[in-house]
Amino acid sequence: MALLVEKTTSGREYKVKDMSQADFGRLEIELAEVEMPGLMASRAEFGPSQPVKGAKITCSLHMTIQTAFLIETLTALGAEVRWCSCNIFSTQDHAAAAIARDSAAVFAWKGETLQEYWWCTERALDWGPGGGPDLIVDDGGDATLLIHEGVKAEEEFAKNGTVPDPTSTDNVEFQLVLTIIKESLKTDPLRYTKMKERLVGVSEETTTGVKKLYQMPANGSLLFLPINVNDSVTKSKFDNLYGCRHSLPDGLMRATDVMIAGKVALVAGYGDVGKGCAAAMKQAGARVIVTEIDPICALQATMEGLQVLFLEDVVSEVDIFVTTTGNKDIIMVDHMRKMKNNAIVCNIGHFDNEIDMHGLETFPGVKRITIKPQTDRWVFPDTNSGIIVLAEGRLMNLGCATGHPSFVMSCSFTNQVIAQLELWNERSSGKYEKKVYVLPKHLDEKVAALHLGKFGAKLTKLTKDQADYIYVPVEGPYKPAHYRY
């Protein structure tokens, strides 16, 4: 593939769409600063001691204004950073340009092909002859996946000389992963093994990536220590819930200018993301239907006044479909053919397999009309009616808008900073086994406390007698690990 790494005048590598947007990106990064108190507090607390000085951190996470602030927090604490996006549509090009010019190696642009996406991931992991990164910040697990698959292939190659066969799978993305590894074996048959040996650990941002990590210790395939950032309360109950409540209608209105009030909206899944999406649609005046497999989540939905029904029973009545499940094959092409004309179909789960895009793209005679980037009308030949699909079935809030606002991302990214510090500081202590960990409750409460001042909130203080009465320390933590917020 004819992509070339470029370099700044200082020698830092990058590949972005347009470096002339760097000044614009810098202005928006400065604007975000006021809305990210947790990251600012992290810089103030840890900056003087440079706790990750010398650490090489590879990050696979949406390249946005908000993540730009995370990058510059990590570099302010002493780290070197190489960055790629975890989604082909989510990069904000002005943010990428500003960071590439000023702070870190960036390989990301909006509208990457899948081949370009995996090239960027490979570049972010490439730290030269010294091996790979010391730490990874991952979102969805793609950087983690590439290393694990690379090590597996290198072990097979060393044992019996076999190389990966990209034609062995029908999954287009996995074909590209196997192709990268196959080419790597020609130049360095121990490339990913050396990465594994250097790596301290990974902090994983999202539900989908965390699910993958929890499977690995059971089958013995986990190669390095992971911290599950997603299940910190100050991530999942804020980013996933309130972030989606903000960014779903933003993406819908930017992409389609649709009036949500009076429409029928279906939200597939009623976890934290689904709850935020359903609340957004209800608050905007839509009648909301939920599909759900879990009876507890379904009961929660009914208590919020929502209907819980089968997709098949209402598919022809719904105006707006939103998938939030993290699963696959939720809305299939047969469902789409039964939808009303110009029904909107979108996804806010991490990957693009909740909506059957392959079935839609290969449906005989279907016609794709691109209205604007990431907004396509697909017309079926037998009915001459169509549906509107956003962001090609990928994350619509980042593909069609700018994702979650800075404040709620400050909560998530403060957890990421703390997780990276914990991994690095405890790298030789033997504190952690090779299994998935969640940050302790007192750190979760600390992240929340750092964000209260922005709203002028004041915390009531327990007396010693009160604390003893409910069996908690005066300074917290105030809830047990199993408490459900």
UniProtKB/Swiss-Prot annotation:
Gene Ontology molecular function, alphabetical: adenosylhomocysteinase activity
SMART domains xref list: AdoHcyase, AdoHcyase_NAD
Residues noted as binding substrate in the record, renumbered to the chain: 64, 139, 205, 235, 239
Top-rank lineage group of the source organism: Eukaryota
GO terms for cellular component: cytosol
Cofactor binding notes: Binds 1 NAD(+) per subunit.
Database matches in InterPro entries: Adenosylhomocyst_ase-like_sf, Adenosylhomocysteinase-like, Ado_hCys_hydrolase_NAD-bd, NAD(P)-bd_dom_sf, S-Ado-L-homoCys_hydrolase_CS
Signal peptide: none
Binding annotation for NAD(+): 206-208, 240, 269-274, 292, 327, 348-350, 397
Metabolic or biological pathway, per its Swiss-Prot or TrEMBL entry: Amino-acid biosynthesis; L-homocysteine biosynthesis; L-homocysteine from S-adenosyl-L-homocysteine: step 1/1
Disulfide bonds listed in the record: none
GO biological process per UniProt: one-carbon metabolic process; S-adenosylmethionine cycle
Catalytic activity: S-adenosyl-L-homocysteine + H2O = L-homocysteine + adenosine
Swiss-Prot/TrEMBL cofactor(s): NAD(+)
EC class (word): hydrolase
EC number(s) from the headed UniProt entry: 3.13.2.1
Keywords: Hydrolase, NAD, One-carbon metabolism
Family indicated by similarity: Belongs to the adenosylhomocysteinase family.
Function: Adenosylhomocysteine is a competitive inhibitor of S-adenosyl-L-methionine-dependent methyl transferase reactions; therefore adenosylhomocysteinase may play a key role in the control of methylations via regulation of the intracellular concentration of adenosylhomocysteine.
Name of the protein: Adenosylhomocysteinase
Organism, as annotated: Solanum lycopersicum (Tomato)
